[in-house]
């Protein structure tokens, strides 16, 4: 099911009406700037929500002062307030990131042109973040669990849902990215690596980056074919692999995928969320013997540090892949064609 995040219950329409108008104008200018540099609407919406929390805190606790007059002591007090109210370290880092991004905008854009921001310098980076601590039990899937889910969905003729699960399993993309695949991303001319992978056209991903996304063809094809046959038989025409119900000119909505996640959780009896399949995909590639550096390229990470976060294979199991019968053995290492 969609995982629950503790929310900061601080904003309200009444409080928003009383927030310092200069701060609200600053926020609007910042969001306009983000649109001008083509940040995604999801990213902009996140900044909007987070900054509303920040400005409401300033209203309640800091005398509704101008944003540019915040001190390091103010930021420490805000961080402590978040900790005291039970926010996760990841959530605190996100809120501080919103403050940091707005501060950078003030420093790089406004400090030269606006007298109110003359000589402004960002101070957020001087405040140490709380250590990252997991707040949820991570769902680690065995092959047979997810294959059982695919079998059940196929048996129920839920071909679109099965195709979605298979794409997440064998492509490892984030939930928002899974919405953005098109039918044309899975045609013969998109097959690469000796027939082992589909390589999509560039898709908008986190951080406003466009990446070519890879999917394991042999594993994914049965569920893709079932869904495309169902679409053909039922007159479903859309460029999107998963079209929006009632408006096939648009891709499926996140709210629909969240509802599906509840269904998958009931079927599996475990907490099903799309991001757990990103871990599954990375772990499966590693388990198959694909070098870490190649996995990093497949996912599109800029750093190998992310691999360590997403690889759920026990350390001893990874080491054991290269040894057998009392000696080094690399014969078990597979290529893409073998996965």
Question: What is the meaning of each model-derived region?
Answer:
Residues 299-325:
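Catalytic-site neighborhood detector that most strongly recognizes the C-terminal catalytic loop/helix
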Residues 109-112, 168-194, 293-294:
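Short, charged phosphate-coordinating catalytic segments
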Residues 28-136:
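N-terminal core-binding DNA-recognition domain of tyrosine recombinases/integrases
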Residues 1-14, 325-339:
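C-terminal secondary-structure termini that scaffold catalytic or DNA-interacting sites
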Residues 180-222:
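Conserved tyrosine-mediated DNA breakage-rejoining catalytic core shared by Y-recombinases
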Residues 237, 258-297, 301, 316:
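Short, basic (Lys/Arg/His-rich) helix/loop patches that form interaction surfaces
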Residues 143-175:
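Basic, Lys/Arg- and aromatic-enriched nucleic-acid-binding interface segment
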């Amino acid at each position: 099911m969609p995982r629950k995040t503790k929310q900061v219950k601080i904003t309200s329409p009444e409080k928003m009406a009383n927030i310092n108008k200069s701060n609200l104008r600053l926020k609007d200018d910042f969001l306009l700037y983000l649109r001008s540099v083509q940040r995604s609407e999801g990213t902009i919406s996140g900044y909007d929500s987070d900054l509303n929390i920040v400005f409401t805190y300033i209203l309640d606790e800091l005398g509704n002062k101008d944003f540019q007059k915040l001190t390091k002591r103010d930021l420490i007090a805000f961080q402590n307030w978040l900790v005291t109210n039970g926010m996760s370290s990841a959530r605190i880092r996100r809120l501080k990131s919103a403050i940091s991004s707005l501060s950078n905008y003030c420093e790089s854009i406004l400090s030269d042109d606006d007298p109110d921001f003359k000589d402004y310098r960002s101070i957020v980076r001087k405040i140490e973040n709380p250590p990252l601590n997991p707040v949820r039990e991570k769902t680690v899937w065995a092959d047979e669990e997810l294959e059982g889910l695919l079998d059940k969905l196929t048996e129920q003729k839920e071909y679109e849902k099965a195709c979605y699960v298979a794409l997440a399993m064998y492509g490892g993309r984030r939930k928002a990215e899974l919405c953005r695949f098109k039918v044309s991303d899975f045609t013969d001319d998109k097959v690469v690596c000796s027939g082992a992978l589909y390589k999509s056209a560039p898709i908008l991903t986190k951080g406003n980056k466009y990446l070519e996304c890879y999917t394991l063809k042999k594993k994914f094809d049965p569920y893709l074919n079932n869904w495309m046959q169902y679409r053909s038989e039922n007159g479903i025409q859309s460029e999107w692999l998963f079209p929006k119900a009632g408006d096939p000119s648009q891709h499926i909505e996140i709210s629909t995928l969240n509802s599906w996640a509840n269904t998958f959780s009931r079927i599996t009896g475990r907490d099903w969320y799309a991001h757990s399949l990103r871990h599954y995909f990375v772990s499966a590639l590693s388990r198959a013997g694909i070098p870490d550096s190649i996995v990093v390229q497949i996912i599109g990470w800029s750093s190998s540090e992310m691999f360590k976060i997403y690889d759920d294979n026990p350390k001893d199991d990874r080491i054991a892949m290269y040894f057998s019968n009392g000696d080094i053995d690399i014969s078990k290492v597979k290529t893409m064609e073998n996965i």
